[in-house]
Each structure stands twice: as C-alpha cells, then as structure tokens.
Amino acid sequence: MTDNSAPAPETKSGPRVALFVTCLVDLFRPSIGFAAVKLLEDAGCRVEVPSQQVCCGQPAYNSGDAASARRIAKQVIETFTGFDYVVGPSGSCMATIRKEYPAMFKDDAAWDAQARALAERSYELMSFLTDVLGVSTAKVHFQGHATYHDSCSGLRSLGIKEQPRRLLSAVDGLTLTEQQDSETCCGFGGTFCVKYPEISVKMVSDKVGNIDMTGADTLLGGDLGCLMNIAGRLRRLGKTVRVYHAAEVLAGMADRAGIGDPETR
C-alpha cells in the first residue's frame, strides 16, 4: 500500500489517526487499506500510514516465540507513538495490540507503560467508526444479499458484533441475513490452518454450508484472513458467492473483483 505518512493538511482539525495496514491487507488486498483511509477521512480524521510499520507479531506470539513477538511489538510501539489513535481493518491484529501487548510487557518497567498506552489508543476499524467517532450512516449503494462472518478475535477479544452490522444496515440496496453459527470459527486461525489442515478444512466447509443456507450472494467480514480462507473454499467448491471486506462496501469501493476472484471478473 502506498505510503501516506506525510502530515495531513493543517486545515483539518480532527484526530490524528495512524492506519495499521496489517500484513495480509498490504500483501494481498491493498484496496481494504484504501477503503479504511477513505472511511476515516470521511469521518473527519487526519490519516497517516507510517511506512516503517511491521507485523503486529501475532504469528510469533501464538507459536510460542515470545522473544521475537516482543521484539516486533517494540517496533510497533515505537512506530505508532505520538498518534491520537491507531486503527486497523482487522480484529485479529488489533486484539493483539490491545490485549497481548500489555501482557507481553507487564513485567518490563521500560516498556510496560508504552505498551498499555498504545493498547488504549488502538481500535479495530468498525469499532472505531461507531464507538469512538459515532458514525451511524453509510451514503453508498451496494446491490446484494449478504451474510456476515464474525472473526473470532474481533468477536471474543474485542466484543465486535453489532458495530459492522449497524453500519452495513445503512447501505442502500444491501440486505443482510444472519447465518447459522455465525460466531463459529472458519478454521483459519492464523497458523492453525497450517498446523491442523484437516480440521481447518472441515471447519471452513461447515462455514460454507451455513453461508449456502442463507441464499446470500455476498459474504462480508472484518478480517481478511478469514475472508481469504472462506473465499478459497467457496471457489474450490464452485460457489459464486462474492466476498468483500466490510470496509470496501462501506467506502463504496466494492466495484472490483471479490476476494479470491480473478481481477477480470
């Protein structure tokens, strides 16, 4: 994703927000990052994208490599110091910063206060828009019948459930239908799908079955890892359900191929 770290114009007086792009968005779906910037700027924020940002450290942390996770976390803390807020389009990454960073440094006097300060200023995108900025409208059109997938980290660690639905319900032309077991894991789980592929395939197959039962033509969600995993299974099974990050729809930027689809679609 193109760097946008230059200071915002002085004419803007809104909060200074740093976008935590996330590895997956940067590498596989930069449009989500651009959608996040648009949503934040439309809400009055001065958005910057620090070019030196790195991974949140979650893969290392979840794999038991505490030393590497702490080293990466220190880079993140240093990079995002000085902003009013840090916002990311992923419940998974932002839960790591909000919940795990304070735990990583609770016995480290040199970093404890900084880790807690960053955690308190960090938010998942949908939560930030609704809970902090008070956004309740979406002045865009998206024609489709969608169902929403709740990511485990966003739901269980950050309590994100109604926020994206509230925003999406305001989108003209969009119908939302809840799927059975919407809160059940899709089987991605970061490194989980690599360590336990057979279990992961069974879980995502069940998820696809639940999506099928809704009759929806579109799947929406707030974590690219989950969406890529589900989209991959949908395509392998020959399903035509479109897959988008909620930010793409809310920003009016879902006029491109869905996640997992050829760009020529």
Give the label of every model feature segment.
Residues 1-265:
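Iron-sulfur cluster-binding electron-transfer modules in prokaryotic oxidoreductases
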